[in-house]
Curated annotation (Swiss-Prot):
Modified residues (Phosphoserine): S119, S201, S391
Membership in a protein family: Belongs to the WD repeat PRL1/PRL2 family.
Name of this protein: Pleiotropic regulator 1
Region of interest: Disordered: 135-160
Its biological purpose: Involved in pre-mRNA splicing as component of the spliceosome. Component of the PRP19-CDC5L complex that forms an integral part of the spliceosome and is required for activating pre-mRNA splicing. As a component of the minor spliceosome, involved in the splicing of U12-type introns in pre-mRNAs.
Keyword flag Acetylation: yes
A biological-process GO annotation: protein localization to nucleus
InterPro entries for the chain: G-protein_beta_WD-40_rep, Prp46/PLRG1-like, WD40/YVTN_repeat-like_dom_sf, WD40_repeat_CS, WD40_repeat_dom_sf, WD40_rpt
Species of origin: Homo sapiens (Human)
Gene behind the chain: PLRG1
Length: 514
């Protein structure tokens, strides 16, 4: 006779299986996981060796053990040895400098002032925590004794927060962490504000470039009206107009070694003017496109020009020969500067890079790629071995000879066309929107912002600064602007540190984004 099997739902069968499984292991539910003594010892040994290895086992001589004991309450911590049961390992107990109280924050009472032997559980835990020593470790451990302390512990003073912690082991010294002084931001030097002193008009187009002659008697400007004009610096009156370029004049410079004026323009021409006869005596041919800037070497008769053809050229002033063609930029070279020290030539380009060149070899020494936008201006500090570059993203300061980055000067959010700096550390940046910012060179503090009004007869949109320069006495600042004028600024003689205080707060961390 076939026995009928009672049918159950899947849900019931699953729960019955779960119950059987639970009943099978129910005895182990409340049982703790057994402790593996060997692995626990190894774990504690590794932790102690990593964290307390240099100070846990310090070698000492038997004579020092006999002579030196804990002298006073200021001695260092000591290792005490307590005998264990026969046939077991020696157990160590680490005691503090005082027999009482047993821990921080414990009140001193009749009960806590008594120094007790460690309990069995405490001694067992300490014994487990001690590392397993190899033979090499055993050779350098201290000999058995009632107690010992580190050599020289009582001789050294208690370290303060600003002192270094030194542990002496025989004749060697292991220096531990030394507290460092918190970094401080230098306070910017106070500079008097600059105010508009004079506006000079006479050009019929944008004034694109400006230069002051070494004698500080006159200055020269070049304009989009294709003329070069020479002005009296003291009175601001026009002295002379020179014609010869057939397009915008983009750069002018006066030689300190001879009575020559050099100019360049968008007509690809580079001209040398003899100021005794007021005429062109030399042409320098070679550029394939507009010439954007030029500079003279301070110690040798060498002229350097930069162009929209992505090259800079080095010319012999006397022979008109092209000594080197500095190629490497991938876009128009907007600015060039020369100095007597290495590197002698610095160029900034619309390809966002700055290159430092070897004048003798005509090759690139360093390429700086930190800027993200076109570099239209570069200026060298007259005293420090540093320079600055201007770009629409920010102004950056660099250190020669390798172009090490110093700091960012952020805040002039415009296309920066020109930079100039004087020996007092006043950096001036002029932008295409007509704003001019003045900075402290050392700290990068922006102490003044100027936006001169557009002159009558010019459109409001014609607001832009294309060039600026200090005169030789550094008491006047001249700017060449898009409203066809030259503006002259002077320091405010009535300003003091009380009337115009430095509104500066130190930053916690100076941002040095590349």
């Amino acid at each position: 006779m076939v026995e009928e099997v009672q049918k159950h739902s899947v849900h019931t069968l699953v729960f019955r299986s779960l119950k059987r499984t639970h009943d099978m292991f129910v005895a182990d539910n409340g049982k703790p996981v057994p402790l593996d003594e060997e692995s626990h010892k190894r774990k504690m040994a590794i932790k102690l060796r990593n964290e307390y290895g240099p100070v846990l086992h310090m070698p000492t001589s038997k004579e020092n053990l006999k002579e030196k004991g804990p002298q006073n309450a200021t001695d260092s911590y000591v290792h005490k040895q307590y005998p264990a049961n026969q046939g077991q390992e020696v157990e160590y107990f680490v005691a503090g400098t005082h027999p009482y109280p047993p821990g921080p924050g414990v009140a001193l009472t009749a009960d806590t002032k008594i120094q007790r032997m460690p309990s069995e559980s405490a001694a067992q835990s300490l014994a487990v925590a001690l590392p397993l020593q190899t033979k090499a470790d055993a050779n350098r451990t201290a000999p058995s004794g009632s107690e010992y302390r580190h050599p020289g512990a009582s001789d050294r003073p208690q370290p303060t927060a600003m002192n270094s912690i030194v542990m002496e082991t025989g004749n060697t010294k292991n220096s531990a962490l030394m507290a460092k002084k918190a970094p401080t931001m230098p306070k910017p030097q106070w500079h008097p504000p600059w105010k508009l002193y004079r506006v000079i008009s006479g050009h019929l187009g944008w004034v694109r470039c400006i230069a002051v002659e070494p004698g500080n008697q006159w200055f020269v400007t070049g304009s989009a009206d294709r003329t070069i004009k020479i002005w009296d610096l003291a009175s601001g009156k026009l002295k002379l107009s020179l014609t010869g370029h057939i397009s915008t004049v983009r750069g002018v410079i006066v030689s300190t070694r001879s009575p020559y004026l050099f100019s360049c323009g968008e007509d690809k021409q580079v001209k040398c003017w003899d100021l005794e006869y007021n005429k062109v005596i030399r042409h320098y041919h070679g550029h394939l496109s507009a010439v954007y800037g030029l500079d003279l070497h301070p110690t040798i008769d060498v002229l350097v020009t930069c162009s929209r053809d992505s090259t800079a050229r080095i010319w012999d002033v006397r022979t008109k020969a092209s000594v080197h063609t500095l190629s490497g930029h991938t876009n128009a070279v907007a600015t060039v500067r020369c100095q007597a020290a290495e590197p002698q030539i610095i160029t900034g380009s619309h390809d966002t890079t700055i290159r430092l060149w070897d004048l003798v070899a005509g090759k690139t020494r360093v390429t700086l790629t930190n800027h993200k936008k076109s570099v239209r201006a570069v200026v060298l500090h007259p005293r420090h071995y540093t320079f600055a570059s201007g770009s629409p993203d920010n102004i950056k300061q660099w250190k020669f000879p390798d172009g090490s980055f110093i700091q960012n000067l952020s805040g002039h959010n415009a296309i920066i066309n020109t930079l100039t700096v004087n020996s007092d550390g006043v950096l001036v940046s002029g932008a295409d929107n007509g704003t001019m910012h003045l900075w402290d060179w050392r700290t990068g503090y922006n102490f003044q912002r100027v936006h001169a009004a557009v002159q009558p007869g010019s459109l409001d949109s014609e607001s832009g600064i294309f060039a600026c320069a200090f005169d030789q006495s550094e008491s006047r600042l001249l700017t060449a602007e898009a409203d066809k004028t030259i503006k002259v600024y002077r320091e405010d003689d009535t300003a003091t540190e009380e009337t115009h205080p430095v509104s500066w707060k130190p930053e916690i961390i100076k941002r040095k984004r590349f």
